Amino acid sequence: MRKTFPLEKYRWPILPAGILLVWIGSFAGPDRALAQAIVENPAKPKAANAGRVVVPQEALVISDEGTSDYYFKWPRGLKTAPDGSLSLIDESQVLRFDKSGKFLQNLFKKGQGPGEVNNVSACLPVVKNFIIHSPYPNKLVFFDLAGKYERELPVRSETRSMMTALLFHGGTFYFETREFPRVKGDPDYVDSPHSILAVSEATGEIKTLSAFPTRAFVVSSPSGGGGMFDITSLIAVPFKERLLALTHTSEYLLKIYNPEADKIIREFRRAYERVKPEPLTEEQKKGGLIIDGKHYGPPELKFQNDVRNLLARCDEIWAVTSTKDKAKGILIDVFDGEGVYRDSFWLKLPEAALKSVIYPGFCALDGDFLWVVERSEDETFAVKKYRVVI
């Protein structure tokens, strides 16, 4: 069996340290999408007031205190719907709240029958439906906006690799999937392929589209076992309803991908001063992999990934950078749909909120509002909504 470890572990409860992956299938091909020339931006954006400090105002708080309708153990997978409502995933829960924070329903029903699931990997709120993806059994479950079950669509993928739903548009679902890289010999840095899959809503037909390689440190074993530490990941967010804004490299590079055309329509970056990571703690060094009785700790990296997360709204793509200041917060770069570096600002939030802004899936941008998961010192969770006026 193969094990995959995120190199940078979250500082709150997560899934067990190792995620088991079955090593099957062939190595995904290179990024096939044809791109235009990379848009090169200077270190400073066009906005005259770039670099200002923005302090969001707390609008509301959702907690599990005083309710038996739901509980927060590890809320994640935050998504907003066109009506401003919020959805998220937790243990045996798919929770929906309206834009004012009022609890609507839990759509999770355990089982293998119609409308039932054993676990959920993603939820996709769209204009007329609310859709959840269950990896086991692999299917898409449709609900109306009132939370009533409508139907389900089996996803008959030939691969057993993990699939993550990214986007639904024009009758097609788009997923990210990955394969464990085939390697032999000493531990090494390798490309780990992440492919985009298109699944037809009408027929369930699956088509493999472009692949976006990420970087991983892989340990192999002559016995067939092995594992890897993810160094970069594919971060992809819906942009203008039908596109994906994404990044998958350690150095600064963003892309706008049209999955319907299977084509990168824009690549862009800006001059960026790279940030060194904090040294590994003794606890981190002791963690890692045990392969054939030998311990492998996470590799020491020279730099952090330049772009830690992506958010999008209207014609803007927000790149959450690795640049952080104790007094100012995190530096956010703002690009338009043409790849032009328009603006930048420091996002100043409580430290618990900033941790969620860095990690994909733990925050969601909806117009002037930012939903964020926060963990308090007493180990409890809350979801907060902030008004962000830039």
Language model features by range: what are they?
Residues 11-20:
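Sec-dependent N-terminal signal peptides
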Residues 1-10:
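N-terminal secretory signal peptides that target proteins for export/translocation
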